[in-house]
């Protein structure tokens, strides 16, 4: 069943659309939102506002939106690990980092084979706890990334 909130550009997708799903806009004050990660234990969602170099937080209990972290190293993709910590791909930091429960940032990976990462973009945490991420070169050329040349 097609709902007015969704525009299906390919009729074949209709079989995947659930009739009981609706869209809800949570916030409009970002320039470019990406990388949502949900924390079920805390009932909140975080996402990146990449050009504004901040992570935003939406509280499911009261609907409020606040800044979760700033600066955020122009973080992009996120995931939550098995211990409930935020894993993030940082364009400016050229690394994959983790925000600890006390708020401190730990760099998990910033190089491979002796070369700096380019522009980590998306990340998932596998059920065994291993972290998989993409590292394309295109983000390194954007204005808000590290000024260091591509490795």
Where do the model's predicted regions map?
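Conserved small/polar residues in nucleotide/adenosyl-binding loops
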Residues: 144-151
């Amino acid at each position: 069943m097609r709902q007015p909130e969704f525009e299906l550009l390919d009729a074949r997708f209709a079989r995947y659309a659930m009739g009981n799903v609706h869209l809800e806009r949570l916030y409009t004050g970002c320039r470019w939102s990406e990388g949502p990660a949900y924390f079920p234990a805390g009932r909140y969602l975080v996402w990146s506002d990449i050009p504004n170099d901040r992570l935003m937080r939406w509280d499911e209990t009261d609907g409020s939106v606040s800044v979760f972290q700033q600066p955020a190293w122009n973080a992009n993709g996120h995931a939550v690990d098995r211990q409930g910590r935020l894993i993030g791909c940082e364009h400016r930091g050229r690394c994959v980092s983790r925000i600890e429960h006390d708020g401190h940032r730990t760099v998990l990976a910033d190089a491979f084979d002796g070369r700096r990462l380019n522009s980590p973009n998306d990340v998932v945490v596998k059920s065994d706890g291993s972290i998989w991420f993409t590292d394309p070169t295109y983000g390194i050329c954007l204005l808000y990334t590290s000024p260091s040349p591509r490795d």
